[in-house]
Amino acid sequence: MPNEHMKINNVVAILMSVRDEESYIDLNISYHLDLGFDYIFIANHCSTDKTNEIMDSYKDDSRVIVIEEKDPIFNHAKIANKLLNYANINYKIDWFIFLDADEFLSIKDETVKNFTARLEKNDIPYATIGWANALFDHTLSDYTCSPVHAIDTTKYYYPWPEKTWQEYGHFRKAIVKNHKNIEIVVGGHYVKTENNPKFFGEYNRDPFIVPKNEAKLLHFEFRNKADAVYKKWEKLASFENDSTSDTNSPWLERIRTIKKYVEDFKDNIDEINKRWFLEHRTFWGATIPEDRIVYDSTLSLWYRKYFRRKIESGKIKSVCLVRSGNLGDVIMTEPVARFLSKYVDQIYLATKIEWAESIFNTYNKVYRYNQVNSGEIDCDIMIKLVYELSDNQKTYIQGYMESIGFGEMAVKDIPILNSEWKNTINGEYILIAPLTSWWEEKKRNWGYKKFVELSKLLETEYNTTCVMLEKHYSFSEMMSLIRHCKLFVGNDAGPAIIVQSFSKRAFIIFGATHPKYIHMSRYTVPVYNRNIHKLCKHRTRKEELDCCEEFCMERITVGEVFNQIRLHV
C-alpha cells in the first residue's frame, strides 16, 4: 500500500549562494535535481572561475534559476534574503532549504518530496538537519576516503561544540515550509520565527531536530584537497561579512581564525595536507575521535549515475579508471575499459601494479596510483572501479560495470591482454601457481605442500615437467610462463585470471571466494567445495568471506583435484 504522504506533492526549492565553486556546483545541482527538487535558486556571487561556464550550461533548464550578485562583499543573510524574495515573487514554493555548494542532502526517503510530505503529515513546519563533515585521505591508504573526485568519500564525522560559544545548532541547517514574512538569519542557517510565531506553533523557538538516521547534510568543508580549501579561506577572509551579528559576537572567532590560517599557511600547503588530510582534524585543530566517525555511501552510489550521464552526453573525451590492486582485480578492468572506449577517445588506468602498462593494449596510458591526486593525470573525468559494493550474485567485472553506472549492461568478455611474451622454457610444461596475495590468504590458498604433491602426480601421469610459479620470478617471466604453459593449476589469484586470456586449459582451486564471481573462459574448470554454503543465504561478498573458516580449503583433497584434471584433459 502506498504511503499516505506520497499524496502530498510539495514544490521544494534550494536557495544557494556560490562564489568560485567550479569543483562542486555541477555535482551539487545534478545531485539535488535527481533527489527531486523542483527549483534551485542560485546567487552567483562574483565568480571568476569555471562556475560561470557551468551555470551557463543550465540556462535551458527551467529548474535552475541563476541570479547574478555584483556586490563583492559576502553578506550571506543579505544575499539569501534577496534570493528568497525573488523566488517568492516569481514562483510558488512550498518548502525551502538553504544550502551551500559543498552541502549535499542525504535522506532516508527516495525523494525530497517524500521527505517534506512526511514532515507536513507530522505537523512539522520547521526542522533542522545536521552536518556530517567529509573526511579525505590523500595518502590513499584508507580506501573509504581516498578520493579520485571532489565527493569521493564514504567517511564523515559529526561535528561537536569545541568553543564555549558554540552550540549543536551551529552544525545544522533549516528546512522550512514557506510562510508569511519569511526571513533568513544566522548566516543562512535558520529563519526568524518572531516574524510569524503563530505559523511555527510549538516550533516557534526550537525547530524540530531531524534524527541523523533520517537525514544529514554531507558537508565538504575542506573540499577534497589542500589548495582548494586554502583558496576558499582566502575568499572568505577577503569578502565575508555577517550583517545579522554584532561585531563582538563570539562566533566571529571563526572568520578571524580563517584570516589567521590564510597567513599561517601561505606557501605551506603541505601543512594543510598533514593536519586535515592525513591526521583528520576539525577546523579548530582537534583530532576527530572514532566515536564521531560515520559512513555514508549516498554520494558514491549516486556518482555512478552522474558518470554515466556525462559519458553518454558525448562531451567526455577521456576517462581514467582507478583500481589500486590486486593483480587479478586490475586485469579484470580491461573489459570495462573496452566497453567505455565506445564512448570516449582516450582511456587511462591508474594502479599500483608495476608493469601494468606492458599487459594491456586497451589503455592509452597507465599511471601510477600515487599520481591520482597529483594533478598529473590529464583527463576529463576519473572514477574508481569498485565491485565490493555490489551483491554476491554478480561477477567482479559486472560489479565494475555497476560502479560506472552501467550495471544493466551484461559484460561476459574475458580480458584481452598483450600476448607477446618470449618463451623461456624449452618443451611442454604444466604451470603450478601455489601463491596468492595477502588478501584473505589463509582462506584462499590451498597450501604449498598440496601443490607439490599434486605436481608429482601430474608429472608421472602426463610424463611432463611441472614448473612452480615462485616469488623469485620477475613479472615478465611470470607472464611468459603463463602464456606458454600447456596446462595451468592454481589458487584463485592474479595468474589464474591472466591464464584465461591466453585460452589455456586451467584448473582454479577456490576457497573463500567463489567461481560465480569470475566469468570464466570455456577452457577453465573450477574446483571447490560445493557444499560449503548449503545452509547459508548470503547477500554480500563479505558475509560469504566471513562465513568461511581457514580450514575450509583443507576439505579439498589432492586426489579430488587430480581426478578433475584427468577428467578434463
Which stretches of residues belong to each language-model region?
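A conserved acidic beta->alpha catalytic loop
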Residues: N44-I54, D71-I73
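Short beta-strand-to-loop acidic/aromatic patch adjacent to the donor-nucleotide binding site
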Residues: K92-S106
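Donor-binding and catalytic core of enzymes assembling or modifying cell-surface/extracellular glycoconjugates
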Residues: I331, R444-K516
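Mid-sequence helix-capping/hinge segment at a functional interface
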Residues: K384-Y448, S480
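Nucleotide-sugar donor-binding patch of glycosyltransferase catalytic domains
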Residues: Q500-V569
